[in-house]
C-alpha cells in the first residue's frame, strides 16, 4: 500500500492505493478532519463517491448542504483589517512605501489572499496624533507604529489606546534589532499585540495583517467550519519576522490553486475565507493552551527548541510541546528549529523534522518542509519504496489520477 499524508485546505488525510482502488482515507479520528473534507472544499461528486469515511462525517456541528456551506463560507473571517494607521517618521514612511513598494504589494497580495478588499493606509508622524485620530475615527482596524515617534513611544501609545477603550490591535515594527531588544527590555509590552523587525521587504506588513486577522478570527472560524490551524512557536523577533512571511507566501501559492478550482467566481471568493490560520506563540504556557484549545484543528507545528517556560528559557520546552502535540494528534508533523545542532539527533529520533536556525538555507529548508510534510504542495502518490507514481495539483487532476494510478500494490 502506498500512502502519503497531506493537509492542503482540506485537513490532514492520507492517499492510499489498495487492491486497485485508490481512495482517500482519514488518517486520524478527529472530527475536524472529516468536517474539513466534507464542508470546506466543495469536492466534486465523482471524487466524493470514492472518499471513504468522509461522506457521512461524525461531527458535533450540523451537516450543511451546498447552499448552507456557501453561506457559512461568507461568514468566515468576521474581522478584517480594512484601514491601517501607520505611525512613523516621514523618512521611515518613505522607505516603507518606496523601497518596499508597499501599495503595489498590498494590492497584489490582497487580491491573491481574499479578493475582497485592499487595506487603506493612513500615515501620521507622531504617536500623539495617532491617538487622537484613532479616538475620533473608529474606522481603523490596526495601528502599526515605530518604536518611538514624536514625544511618545509605542508602549505608551498602546497603553493609551487601551485606556481609551479602543479595541484596535497595536503592532510595533522596528528597523534595528538592537533598538528593539532595548525597547522590549525597558518598556512593558502587555498592551502591544506583537513586535516585528523590518528586514528589507514590505512583505512583513502583509504578514502582520494576516497575523492580526488570524488571531482575531481563529476561534470563530474553527468553530464555524473547522478551518485548520498551523501553530508557530518562536520567541526570537528576528526569526519569526523572517519566516512568518515565508509561511504566508506558501499559503498564498496554495490559495491560488484553490481559487482555480472554484465552481464559479462567487465560490472562488468565499473559498478563500477558509485558508489555514497561523497562530504565533512565544512561551510554553501560551503554546500549550493553544494546543489544547485547537487540538482538533492543528495540522502542523513549527517550534523553537528553547523558549520561555515558567518565565525562564528552557531547552526542554520545544520537546515537551512536541510530545504534548503528538500525544493528542499522533500524525501531526512537527518541526523543531534551533541553532544548537546537538539537538538534531534527539529530534530526528523522536520523529520530528529539524531545522538549523543559522543555516544560510533556513528559509529554503522551511519552504521544502512546508511543501513536503505540511501538504502545501501537490498530492503525490508513492510506492512503498517512495517512488512517485502520480501527482495531482488540484481536485480535477486528483479525480483523473484515481483512474490511472497503478494497481497491484500490496499493503
Question: What is the predicted role of each segment?
Answer:
Residues 65-66, 95-98, 102, 107, ...:
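Conserved phosphotransfer microenvironments
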Residues 8-9, 21:
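Intrinsic-disorder-associated, low-complexity terminal segments enriched in Asp/Asn/His/Tyr and depleted
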Residues 152-156, 160-164, 172-196, 202-206, ...:
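Alpha4 helix (beta4-alpha4-beta5 surface) of REC/receiver domains from two-component response regulators
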Residues 87-91, 145-149, 173-176, 199, ...:
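Structural motif
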Residues 10-16, 28-122, 159, 187-194, ...:
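Non-catalytic signal-transmission and effector/linker regions of two-component phosphorelay proteins
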Amino acid at each position: 500500500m502506498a500512502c502519503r499524508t497531506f493537509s492542503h485546505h482540506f485537513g490532514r488525510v492520507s492517499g492510499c492505493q489498495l487492491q486497485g482502488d485508490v481512495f482517500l482515507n482519514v488518517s486520524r479520528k478527529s472530527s475536524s478532519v472529516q468536517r474539513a473534507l466534507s464542508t470546506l472544499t466543495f469536492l466534486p461528486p465523482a471524487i466524493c463517491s470514492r472518499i471513504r469515511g468522509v461522506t457521512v462525517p461524525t461531527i458535533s456541528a450540523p451537516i450543511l448542504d451546498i447552499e448552507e456551506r456557501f453561506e457559512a463560507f461568507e461568514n468566515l473571517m468576521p474581522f478584517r483589517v480594512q484601514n491601517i494607521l501607520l505611525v512613523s517618521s516621514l523618512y521611515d514612511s518613505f522607505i516603507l512605501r518606496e523601497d518596499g513598494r508597499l501599495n503595489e504589494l498590498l494590492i497584489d497580495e490582497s487580491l491573491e489572499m481574499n479578493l475582497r478588499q485592499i487595506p487603506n493606509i493612513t500615515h501620521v508622524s507622531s504617536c500623539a496624533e495617532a491617538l487622537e485620530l484613532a479616538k475620533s475615527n473608529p474606522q481603523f482596524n490596526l495601528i502599526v507604529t515605530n518604536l518611538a515617534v514624536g514625544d511618545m513611544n509605542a508602549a505608551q501609545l498602546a497603553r493609551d489606546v487601551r485606556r481609551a477603550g479602543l479595541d484596535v490591535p497595536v503592532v510595533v515594527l522596528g528597523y534595528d534589532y538592537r533598538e528593539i531588544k532595548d525597547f522590549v527590555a525597558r518598556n512593558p509590552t502587555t498592551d502591544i499585540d506583537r513586535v516585528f523587525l523590518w528586514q528589507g521587504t514590505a512583505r512583513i506588513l502583509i504578514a502582520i495583517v494576516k497575523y492580526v486577522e488570524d488571531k482575531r478570527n481563529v476561534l470563530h472560524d474553527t468553530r464555524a467550519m473547522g478551518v485548520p490551524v498551523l501553530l508557530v512557536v518562536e520567541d526570537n523577533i528576528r526569526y519569526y519576522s523572517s519566516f512568518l512571511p515565508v509561511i504566508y507566501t506558501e499559503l498564498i501559492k496554495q490559495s491560488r490553486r484553490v481559487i482555480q478550482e472554484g465552481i464559479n467566481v462567487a465560490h472562488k471568493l468565499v473559498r478563500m475565507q477558509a485558508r489555514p490560520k497561523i497562530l504565533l506563540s512565544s512561551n510554553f504556557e501560551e503554546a500549550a493552551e493553544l494546543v489544547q484549545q485547537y487540538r482538533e484543528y492543528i495540522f502542523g507545528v513549527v517550534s523553537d527548541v528553547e523558549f520561555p517556560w515558567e518565565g525562564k528559557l528552557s531547552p526542554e520546552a520545544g520537546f515537551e510541546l512536541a510530545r504534548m502535540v503528538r500525544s493528542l494528534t499522533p500524525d501531526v508533523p512537527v518541526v523543531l528549529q534551533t541553532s544548537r545542532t546537538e539537538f538534531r539527533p534527539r529530534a530526528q529520533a523522536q520523529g520530528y523534522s529539524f531545522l538549523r536556525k543559522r543555516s544560510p538555507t533556513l528559509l529554503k529548508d522551511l519552504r521544502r518542509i512546508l511543501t513536503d510534510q505540511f501538504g502545501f504542495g501537490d498530492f503525490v502518490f508513492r510506492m512503498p519504496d517512495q517512488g512517485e507514481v502520480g501527482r495531482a495539483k488540484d481536485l480535477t487532476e486528483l479525480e483523473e489520477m484515481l483512474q490511472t494510478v497503478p494497481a497491484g500494490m500490496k499493503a
